[in-house]
A protein has these predicted regions:
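Iron-sulfur (Fe-S) cluster-binding segments and ferredoxin-like electron-carrier domains
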Residues: 44, 88-105
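Acidic/histidine-rich alpha-helical segments that form the ligand environment
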Residues: 116-160
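Alpha-helical scaffold segments that form or flank carboxylate-/histidine-based iron centers
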Residues: 32-39, 65-80, 156-159
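Acidic/His metal-coordination segments adjacent to aromatic residues that form catalytic metal sites
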Residues: 106-119
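Preference for long, well-ordered alpha-helical segments
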Residues: 152-189
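Mobile cap/lid helix-loop segments that border enzyme active or cofactor-binding sites
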Residues: 1-63, 189-191
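Short, thiol/selenol-centered motifs that function as redox-active sites or metal-ligating centers
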Residues: 69-92, 165
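Short acidic alpha-helix initiation/capping motifs at coil-to-helix transition points
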Residues: 24-25, 46, 81-85, 123, ...
Length: 191
């Protein structure tokens, strides 16, 4: 059971209801994470902006890049053992085309030798591993691989997603955010 009350749409103030409308437009429903974060509507709104402007904006234009974003999110959440974030992001990843083998490789420690991941995916997962373990500062080899496969903008974006999910993983675990039933989880919405 969550350590703080989850704010339902019926209980929400006008500002939060407006933010919730944006959540529904992005994800089709209001997750328990959003209901907890709604105690601070500005934080929830701040969470939504990069999702909309970076993640969802690429769904149709660059689905392979969205798969890489999902691998970064899955690796980060696996390292942090966040059952909540994994319960949403593994299904999101498979719905956009990640294979079970790719998801398993990203979650494990031997991803660099996995035939399921291509060089670009391995570079991103390795970077997420380094950022999450706080070793990226000194990992010039991992950064060189990122530079080989991604623009500087994409490197920043993938690092932002890793940071965002380190934040959400910790928030969900610290506040015991309740898992939704599988048929109540978020889904990418078409733009």
């Amino acid at each position: 059971m969550a350590r703080v009350k989850m704010i339902t749409p019926e209980e929400a103030d006008a500002q939060t209801r407006k933010v919730y409308q944006g959540v529904i437009e992005q994800w089709g429903r209001i997750s328990n994470f959003s209901k907890v974060l709604a105690h601070q509507p500005a934080a929830l709104e701040g969470w939504m902006l990069p999702n909309e402007m970076i993640r969802l904006a690429n769904i149709k234009s660059d689905p392979d890049y969205v798969k890489i974003q999902q691998l970064v999110i899955i690796k980060t959440s696996a390292l942090n053992q966040s059952a909540y974030c994994m319960s949403h992001n593994v299904p999101l990843g498979t719905k956009i085309g990640l294979t079970a083998e790719q998801v398993a490789a990203a979650q494990g420690d031997d991803y660099m030798s996995s035939p399921a991941l291509d060089a670009r995916q391995k570079a991103a997962v390795r970077w997420a591993d380094a950022v999450t373990r706080m070793t990226a500062h000194d990992d010039d080899v991992a950064f060189a691989e990122m530079k080989k496969h991604f623009t500087e903008q994409q490197i920043v974006e993938l690092t932002v997603f890793c940071g965002m999910w380190n934040y959400s993983n910790r928030l969900c675990e610290a506040l015991h955010v309740d898992l939704e039933h599988p048929d109540k989880r978020i889904e990418f919405q078409s733009k």
